[in-house]
Swiss-Prot record:
Superkingdom to which the source organism belongs: Bacteria
GO terms (BP aspect): biotin biosynthetic process
InterPro entries: Aminotrans_II_pyridoxalP_BS, Aminotransferase_I/II_large, AON_synthase_class-II, PyrdxlP-dep_Trfase, PyrdxlP-dep_Trfase_major, PyrdxlP-dep_Trfase_small
Family: Belongs to the class-II pyridoxal-phosphate-dependent aminotransferase family. BioF subfamily.
Reaction equations catalysed: 6-carboxyhexanoyl-[ACP] + L-alanine + H(+) = (8S)-8-amino-7-oxononanoate + holo-[ACP] + CO2
Record flagged with keyword Iron: no
UniProt key word Glycoprotein: no
Protein name as it appears in the record: 8-amino-7-oxononanoate synthase
Cofactors: pyridoxal 5'-phosphate
Classification via Pfam families: Aminotran_1_2
Length: 382
């Protein structure tokens, strides 16, 4: 049978139609410079992406080191700027060492794959970030996915394994609903069964812990020898990039074995300079972390969410994707930019508005949010 004349991409139209019918098509929305909408959608938790010191940190780095890092960190892309920032962030979080990657996604890929591999066991929470899911798939380890925040299931997987090496991976703060992982209990299980714990602090750094040092710091696990922390520089620190923090032996191993580090161009100087400046602002102004949680509580109250949020994230479940998307659109039309999470990001039937609090929200911003959310959610919940 011949297939001549068939378009190899014809199937894309069919898939697009299916997504459209299910209310799951995605589209890029251009954000204008200096827009007037109140931002409850970005991950700029501390409001540092436009902070004068952070912007100047990026500009200063470009002037000194150029627009790009010019190569892999193993060739020409490793600068004094990269290493200085790594040392500063490690000291801030209580880690022995740090290694910067080009994104939080590649940091998770690099850490999980390089620290597991064939003949090992990976135990992953069912709601970990997509980068951790993909890392597990690429690892060639045996993977056990446990129910969300189920410590008993983690212990069962570790206790019944045949593999010598085991790694448990989890977010510290889960991105869709902002709830916290029971890190102390998970670590106790890992210690009993000789497993390494990898924790993604993307949504914990800058918000939880002493002065925003993260949930690991808050539960007394900062610098633990059997814990590896990953995080992004694109949320609380308002820049871009990712980092793996932990024992020096882990850093040395990743330099040798983490493919997203070895074969990727080093993070651009501007991003490193901005992240370092943001870290310095956080050190100087630790109250920003508290302000995030206070503003999240105000948003939760506006949405009739009963519990005080544990993080910057306030999740308002509306059910079907069309309802959530219409609500997000209505908010934007009234000057409020909110996130909209639909499957496959969240389970079917749980499409939601995802609001993110920022330390820099003003009283006027919160008043606008209360007014718009009251109007939009009343209509959406009818």
């Amino acid at each position: 049978m011949t297939r001549a004349g068939l378009s190899p991409l014809a199937w894309l139209d069919e898939v697009a139609d299916q997504r459209r019918a299910a209310g799951l098509r995605r589209a890029l929305r251009t954000r204008p410079a200096g827009g007037t909408a109140v931002d409850l959608a970005s991950n700029d938790y501390l409001g540092l992406s436009t902070h004068p010191r952070v912007v100047e940190g990026a500009v200063r780095a470009v002037r000194e080191w150029g627009a790009g890092s010019t190569g892999s960190r193993l060739v020409t892309g490793n600068t004094e700027l990269h290493e200085g920032f790594e040392q500063a962030l490690a000291a801030f979080t209580g880690a022995e060492s740090a290694l910067v990657f080009s994104s939080g996604y590649t940091a998770n890929l690099g850490a999980v794959v390089a620290l597991s591999g064939p003949g090992s066991l990976l135990v992953s929470d069912a709601l970990t970030h997509a980068s951790l899911v993909d890392a597990c798939r690429l690892s060639r380890a045996r993977v056990v996915v446990t129910p969300h925040r189920d410590v008993t299931a983690i212990e069962t997987a570790l206790a019944t394994r045949d593999e010598q090496r085991a790694v448990v991976v989890t977010d510290s703060v889960f991105s869709a609903d902002g709830v916290l992982a029971p890190l102390r209990d998970i670590h106790d299980v890992c210690r009993r069964h000789g497993a390494l714990l990898i924790v993604d602090e993307a949504h914990g750094l800058g918000v939880r812990g002493t002065g925003g040092r993260g949930l690991l710091d808050e539960v007394g696990l900062a610098g633990a020898p059997d814990v590896v922390m990953t995080t992004t520089l694109s949320k609380a620190l308002g820049s871009q990039g990712g980092v793996v923090l932990g024992p020096l032996a882990v850093r040395d191993h990743l330099i040798d074995a983490a493919r997203p580090f070895i074969f990727d161009t080093g993070l651009a100087p501007a991003a490193v300079g901005a992240a370092w400046a943001a870290l310095e602002v956080l050190v100087d102004e630790p109250s920003r972390a508290r302000a995030v949680l206070d503003n999240a509580a105000a948003l939760a109250q506006a949405c009739d969410v009963p519990a005080r949020p544990d993080s910057a994230v306030v999740s308002v479940i509306l059910g079907e994707p069309e309802v959530a998307l219409a609500a997000a659109t209505a908010c934007l039309e009234q000057g409020l930019r909110v996130g909209c999470f639909r499957p496959p990001t969240v389970p079917a039937g749980t499409s939601r508005l995802r609001l993110t609090a920022r330390a820099s929200l003003t009283d006027d911003d919160l008043d606008t949010a209360r007014r718009v959310l009251a109007d939009v959610l009343t209509a959406a919940r009818r």
